[in-house]
Amino acid sequence: MRCIPTDAVGITLGVDTHKDFHVAVALDGLGRRLGTLSIPTTRSGYEKLAEWANGFGPLESVGIEGTGSFGAGLTRFLRSEGTRVFEVDRPKRRDQYRSGKSDPIDAELAARAVLAGTATGRPKGADGEVEMIRTLRVTRRSAVKARAQAINQLKNLLITAPEGLRSELRGLSTAKLVAKVSEFRPGTNPSDVEAATKFAMRSVARRHQRLSEEISELEEQLDRLVAEAAPELVAMEGVGTDTAASLLIAAGDNSERLKDEAAFAHLCGVAPIPASSGKSVRHRLNRHGNRDANRALYVVALCRMSRDERTRTYVAKRTAEGNTKKEIIRCLKRYIAREIYRVLASLSLNKPPILAP
């Protein structure tokens, strides 16, 4: 580790994050490299980093690559210490071609991005109600996916089952199929193809039932948490628990990091991107941003198109003007994002509740 004494006030730190360790580079206010440090991803490692950085001078700001993944723990620690933390994008290829690729190089590029003012994104808070909702929703989605895989596997087993078993189960709905198969008694040591198939099908059916119970428990917690965190959001036309959860997660616990409704629209990928040149003035579709939040806005738009009179009037007007359904939905998503931002901006998401037993 190389250290350079300096009297420059204000230290900027850049951190390249990994699962088990982080690499940090410190710069002074003039952009001079002061030192490099590698720490484990533990509380003691974070404390060592803060002590090391403050040894050069007062720590002003930190640029971290991956504040929502490998850098989440360090981000929480630094924010609790009152340090300004910025989200830094992955280094651009042109920078890597010029300076090479290594952990210290990436960390230095992160620090210089903060020092130059090009890294201005504030990381999401990960210690409040929205983080609780996110963890539960991620688990629920994986359970829903696993349940779908289970029922598909059960039906595939039925296709290749012996004819007698197929005849017994043919024509049953999914719910009745799972209920009937879960009660099979093939014995502990299947001795023929039909018994082995029954054993396998019963195992899959019971897995489906366990996953359904797990999903119900998670949905109960999500309904409660979302209703407590954002009752005004759930009360909006076309917004349900899952849609509200998606939008809350996109904004984060600290929704004040979004400076205005245009920033929220850009985050959700519903803000048209200028694509003008010379006398040609045009915009192109934004295919970036948080795609899950974009999907949530799409669901709200579809619900309002079928049930909300104000939206139906707007759709009829734009259709008469010659717009296609896709174009109308894009406009609706932008308007809906504006409404939702106003609600999110009025929320106070800083007191994590306790999970119900």
Annotated model-derived regions:
Residues 1-357:
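A detector of single, family-specific signature residues
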